[in-house]
Amino acid sequence: MRPELWNSTAQGSAEQIYKTMSIRRIILVISTAAALLSCSRVGEKECLDFLYESMPLGDSLVYPRSYWEANVRKSLEVRQEMDWGIPDREWMHFVLPLRVNNENLDDFRTLYADTLCRRVKGMSLEQAALEINHWCHEQATYKPSDARTLGPVATITSGLGRCGEESVLAVAALRAAGIPARQVYTPRWAHTDDNHAWVEVWVDGKWHYMGACEPESVLDLAWFNAPVSRAMLLHTKVYGKNYNGGEDVIKRTDAYTEINVIKGYIPSERTVVTVLDREGNKVEGARVDFGIYNYAEFYRVASYLSGHDGQAALDTGIGDMVILASKDSLFGIATCRGKDNSVVLDKRLGQEFSLDLTIVPPVENPLEDRSSEAQKELNARRLIQEDSIRASHPHPRKNAVGLYLSEKDLIDVSDEVLEDAHFEQTSTDPYIVSPRIEREALIPFRQLLRTEAPKAGIRSVEEITAFLRDSIRLSDSRNPQGLRIPPAASWKARESDTKSRDILFVALCRSLDIPSRINPVDGKLQYRNDDGVWVDVDLDSSTPTLRRTGTLSLNYIQGSCPVKTPKYYTHFSISELSEDGTRLMELDDLKEGDYNIALPEGYYMIVSGMRLADGSVNAHVQTVNIKEGVTTVVPLVLRSSDSAPQVIGNMDPEMNFLAEGAEKEQSLLSATGRGYFLICISDSSGEPNVHARRQLEAISGSLNQWGRKVVVLGSMRVDALQNAVYGSDPEGKVEKMLLRGMESERSGRPVIALCDSFGRIVYFSQGYNTSLGEQLGGVISSLEKETGR
């Protein structure tokens, strides 16, 4: 049976499950549950009460009580069978809950718990955790994708997942076998762009980490052992508002307790900020946003109100945070680290100014690798076998021509949704026909709303707006994760949260053949009128408004900067500034080099930056007011480093490698010639290697124009490189030589070095680095200016 969302119109309700279960199975479940109730410290009622007490609004609306009952019974059955000796606190918060993050819930636990328990029966808790991660690797491997998170069953169906989906699968699998597990995030890296998620597992009274679907031979080992040492924040959201496990609490909500786990990984410090007014007085009640520079924005990772002493604090890595403090219409921006920091509210909303910030991340100090060479070799052989197992699994996709669904949607969309989207459908307009609105779970809504809305007197945008304003109860506090509630569920319950109410507005419009969307740039709710103009809608106002827009024209002069064409999210970003803080303009469709940008009237902050090879950032902040019908010209400033590339290590250009198709080894120098060259040692799979290939592809034009050889050793291919020399590194001689020359004591690929024929290394990167292209391009540009080549 294919698992689907639990809904009267969707396949796989609890009633259907019970009908398809054998009589023997039903008797077994009932008898096991009865036995558990008599011997366990927590029973079915206590479990259900615990889940419902902190259940997000969407989960309570979409999934019936029978769904939760079936999963609770299975969880209690596993607890009795496996007898791991898990204390009630860890079991209730880290085994019982189905929800890991913001994924679509499915039937994973009831489908796979027995399989997983059989696989690890008789093992120790540590062995079982490692083995389940191997099972996860048999099901899925890494591939980047969009921000919507697949449920674990859909990830298995796909065979692929980004780190957030791999970790959801791994946590779900561990919990299904009765082992406490949680998903841990660095919300943003400080030394490079992007973020990462992995798994912590509770073994012998302590939390240990694993790379999800990236099994190793021991716990506390993953490819991110080095990058995690440069993190500024590591956190997880624990199901339940009253969790008390000893970790630092970042925030408590009605649904979860957000905790900071950085102290379990690396040295940390208390970053303390004191908010002051212009006269030096401490300001109470100011909003203090702790931010990390990433993807060219100051990404907010935590937010507090200053106390009576004007202070707010957060445990962080030993590096710079960017602080935006604000109260009423005043604000201030500064970099902070350690305990003695102040931010002055010396700016006013609407005030135009510019400032420079230099942001320094923590230094690298890789976590210890406790595995032996023999363990590594055995694990590598297992990974190859697991790759073949995964490749043998079918990975079906649906066909949905004309519905404007993404590749990911075609993995988990149900037949019912596809059929419903065609109900009384004659349009080809994507803003009418597509069942995908935002990141909500896809559940049929068109037939339901097209039939019931007119009965409720709803036929126009004005009537939709009035109905949603007057008849839908908002319960934002019950959905602090911001989970997107499917429109059919909000309609039936007459209850929603603010963002999901927006989704219901779009669904109602589309069901009545009115083009509608949530603007992908600024998140505003819109419909398209008969003149083809997009009109903004405020559901708390009775009057739709035509958008008043102006143009921001960014004037970029390259000068000595190595970047020829700054890119959005890489070199600059634009955020709206208001009393509510900042809101990023998501200009995903902005064409490279197009610096004339239409924006709604408002006050904006332009953040630009150059990330240097050591991970630090030279950032620039510029604010601007955009007025209707006016083109406002603002310089786009990139602060490049004035220093020439430095020699940072040494290597032997006479070291041999085996060129592709050759029978005898040859020296690097004989393949590259005199001058500079690039060496890339990488595998074809694994998240760090996938990112390296994508980064090299992104700057292939610059590398081709540079004209120097790129020696690629290992299984990675970069077809766009015109000067690539492919080969292998027998016995790892080249890799070991580079690591010795850089005095690097850690293992891990990719290894990328920019060298010259004198044996000097001027750029080096090892492991995960999503800023590789930007850094490498900058060094090459500097070399060209210095040497003319």
Where are these regions (language model features)?
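Secondary-structure boundary elements
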Residues: 40-161, 194, 377, 382-493, ...
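Short, acidic Ser/Thr/Gly-rich low-complexity loop/linker segments typical of extracellular
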Residues: 294-315, 578-593
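Short, internal strand/loop/helix patches
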Residues: 711, 720-755
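Hydrophobic/aromatic-rich core segments of domains that either
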Residues: 118-134, 143-153, 158-251, 323, ...
